[in-house]
Amino acid sequence: MSETHLSTQRFADLPLHPEVKQALAENGFEFCTPIQALSLPVLLQSKDIAGQAQTGTGKTMAFLVATFNHLLSTPVPEGRLINQPRAIIMAPTRELAIQIAKDAILLAKHTHLKVGIVYGGESYDVQRKVLDQGVDILIGTTGRIIDYVRQGIIGLNSIQAVVLDEADRMFDLGFIKDIRFLFRRMPEANQRLNMLFSATLSMKVQELAYDHMNEPVKVEIAPEEKTSKNIKEEIFYPSQEEKMRLLLTLIEEDWPEKAIVFSNTKHSCETLWSWLEGDGHRVGLLTGDVPQKKRIRILEQFTSGQLDILVATDVAARGLHISDVSHVYNYDLPDDCEDYVHRIGRTGRAGNKGMSISFACEEYALNLPAIESYINHSIPVSNYDSEALLADIPTPAKIHRKHPSGTRNLRDRSGTSRPGAQRSGARPPRHDRTRRHS
């Protein structure tokens, strides 16, 4: 993490439980991010907060540290049953819940606290077996949590800490009734530590906070600009016929270390995956139709570097913290202005530089004025030479084909392979793009 992304507040100087401090130190957490530096002193006084912070600012570790510290410093409720968690963390998506759980497990290492995760799309019985053994911190999506509550598999009578992450996204997805259902089955707000985080503290989000929290302190880490200065944006105006060739040419020339390609529809994503896979790239596909186990595996492969490119719908645009994404390609301009910000926000994180390349084709160019109005600036236009686009593109792969597990096929354009080539030794660009350096 870049030092410029951190504050001067050390975790070691905060009044944290020794086991929490030990876990933080072992995982390289020395200085707080701004949202952590502002929120933790408030939370460590057992005061509720409504925090405004974007994904990637360190808010997850902020509420996890507060949750663990609160449970370790607070007596277990008298008469608590094994099926009653002490803390509940609600997330809008499965992917975000999984990411939160991974971070929670790091903090749990030296404690007696058990972490459990539940979400739809996974085996109901497998998750139930974990719950039957008892969990202290329950992380999950609201729908699956409600299923277990209604069946009496878990009870919320002993909840001492509550986290509502990505609250604005909860509204977007229509989960607010579920959230209120769960809040009504917990102890009163003044008997628990309540934390709400949202990219925007709109009136509806603030109303939710004041309805179900105990006079929350508002903590805001809102960027002055909607898009980071660390992200270099550019936009092309390709025809629909040249869109795919332009994308393949740009990827060929940029050879990004880790890239996400966004498209507006599942069908378009599948087509993109087929062309990229056929062109020899290590690429994963993430849409709503991909089975949950496969989605998890693809995200793990992309995070670990086994895949270089992730093709995704906006299911991956919110809530996922994937470090070191160097490039974001908007193959389609999104219909929602906020989705543009969330998409390109996958890169340029934690003080790192990033590239955002967008295509304004005939179908989606009409979305551009609203996007530029929303982000308060024009996106620089880049031109290209149609005759310089790759012409010898291999046949697209079939969608049911398995992803390769080996290294990327760094063949030359004549079709001869170079199996010994390594990722770091990729061939240089075939075509000059002087606009990059202008």
Curated annotation (Swiss-Prot):
Residues 243-390 form the Helicase C-terminal domain. The keyword Nucleotide-binding applies. It holds the Pfam family DEAD. Residues 428-438 have a biased composition (Basic residues). One of its GO terms (biological process) is RNA catabolic process. It comes from Shewanella baltica (strain OS155 / ATCC BAA-1091). DEAD-box RNA helicase involved in RNA degradation. Has RNA-dependent ATPase activity and unwinds double-stranded RNA. One of its GO terms (cellular component) is cytosol. GO terms for molecular function: ATP binding; ATP hydrolysis activity; RNA binding; RNA helicase activity. Component of the RNA degradosome, which is a multiprotein complex involved in RNA processing and mRNA degradation. Keywords: ATP-binding, Cytoplasm, Helicase, Hydrolase, Nucleotide-binding, RNA-binding. It is found in: Cytoplasm. NCBIfam families: PRK04837.1. A motif (Q motif) lies at residues 9-37. This is ATP-dependent RNA helicase RhlB. It catalyses: ATP + H2O = ADP + phosphate + H(+). Residues 40-219 form the Helicase ATP-binding domain. Belongs to the DEAD box helicase family. RhlB subfamily. ATP binds at residues 53-60. Residues 395-438 are annotated as: Disordered. Its main location: cytoplasm. The keyword Iron does not apply. Its EC number is 3.6.4.13.
